[in-house]
Curated annotation (Swiss-Prot):
Keywords: Acyltransferase, Cytoplasm, One-carbon metabolism, Transferase. InterPro entries: ForMFR_H4MPT_ForTrfase (IPR014053), ForMFR_H4MPT_ForTrfase_C (IPR002770), ForMFR_H4MPT_ForTrfase_fd-like (IPR023447), ForMFR_H4MPT_ForTrfase_N (IPR022667). It is found in: Cytoplasm. This is Formylmethanofuran--tetrahydromethanopterin formyltransferase. Its EC number is 2.3.1.101. GO terms for cellular component: cytoplasm. Pfam families: FTR, FTR_C. It is an enzyme of class 2 (transferase). It comes from Methylobacillus flagellatus (strain ATCC 51484 / DSM 6875 / VKM B-1610 / KT). Catalyzes the transfer of a formyl group from 5-formyl tetrahydromethanopterin (5-formyl-H(4)MPT) to methanofuran (MFR) to produce formylmethanofuran (formyl-MFR) and tetrahydromethanopterin (H(4)MPT). GO terms for molecular function: formylmethanofuran-tetrahydromethanopterin N-formyltransferase activity. Belongs to the FTR family.
Length: 302
């Protein structure tokens, strides 16, 4: 398959089952909603070392939020319920409770076959030292916690569902600037898709990895088959003209969400085309042996 001169490899991205949740963060204005959201989703690029993968999903108008203030929605994913629950509570306490004027609400209440309620502000209420009060409104419990700027308002729980993490594709280009330009175009397109995040810096990862290493202490190491500087000394996957490879990783609330995002991102990269140095689109997998979700590139782009 060739799109605008760009070869789409006959391969697939291999992804894994995860647990995911959404939190709606509001504040007096968007500046402070983003401050809380960026702090809460910081150091959350990969579950390998960060515990969770998290990112800002989208901006919300006052008409879309529970308290009628501007806000943003964030998504968080982990490999287990226990890790997600702990990370959510820790990040809420350190990043949202602390942020001036910020409030937090459940982002998943319906629309999925199996929703588990997990703590959002249930335990944070104890920061109020006995002065906190609760209110049940439309079947939901909220907590009002006194803080120095007034009150911290938080919903007691949010929803957790079975999700998918690790959808991905690789952009192979003739130069680093061209690869980065294609990634930026892809991320701009994918950022408009709901229910997904691209958790790496700016949505892009340059240090793609393979399983294993010559060093026993490492479980993963550089993906030498896709490193352009190693073409002459390793079993390379790169043709001579490829001088830069970058990867976009996608986490989504459902399998179809990731497919929609991958299609949008790949299409945007291919729009730049071969004339702008974009030569191939590929994907990372483990031979289909580890992850139950297989996102076939040509099937997605058909």
């Amino acid at each position: 398959m060739i799109i605008n001169g760009v070869t789409i490899d006959d391969t697939f991205a291999e992804a894994f089952g995860m647990r995911g949740t959404r939190v709606i963060i509001t504040a007096q204005n968007l500046r402070w909603a983003y401050n809380a959201a960026r702090a809460m989703t910081g150091f959350a690029t990969s579950v390998i070392a960060c515990g969770v993968e998290a990112g800002i999903e989208r901006e919300l108008t006052p008409e879309e939020t529970p308290d009628g203030r501007p806000g943003v929605s964030i998504l968080m994913f982990a490999m287990s319920s226990a890790v997600l629950i702990k990370q959510l509570e820790t990040r809420m306490g350190q990043c949202v409770l602390t942020c001036p004027t910020a409030a937090a609400f459940s982002g998943i209440d319906e629309g999925y076959p199996e929703i588990t309620r997990i703590n959002l502000g249930k335990n944070l209420r104890f920061f109020g030292d006995g002065f906190q009060i609760s209110k049940v409104f439309n079947g939901k419990r909220y907590w009002r916690v006194p803080v120095m700027d007034g009150e911290f308002l938080t919903e007691e729980t949010t929803g957790m569902i079975r999700s998918v993490g690790g959808g991905n594709f690789l952009i192979l280009a003739e130069s680093q600037p061209q690869a980065l330009a294609a990634c930026e175009a892809a991320i701009d397109a994918m950022s408009k898709i709901p229910n997904v995040i691209m958790p790496f810096p700016g949505g892009v990862v340059r240090s793609g990895s393979k399983v294993g290493s010559k060093y026993k202490a490492l479980i993963a190491s550089t993906n030498d088959a896709f490193c352009p500087t190693l073409k002459g000394i390793t079993k390379t996957e790169l043709s001579p003209e490829i001088e830069s490879v970058m990867e976009i990783v996608i986490d989504g609330l459902t399998d179809p969400d990731i497919r929609v995002a991958m299609r949008a991102g790949i299409a945007a990269a291919c729009e730049l085309g071969a004339k702008n140095g974009i030569k191939r689109i590929s994907a990372g997998n483990y031979g289909g042996k580890l992850g139950p979700y297989h996102f076939k590139l040509r099937e997605i782009m058909a």
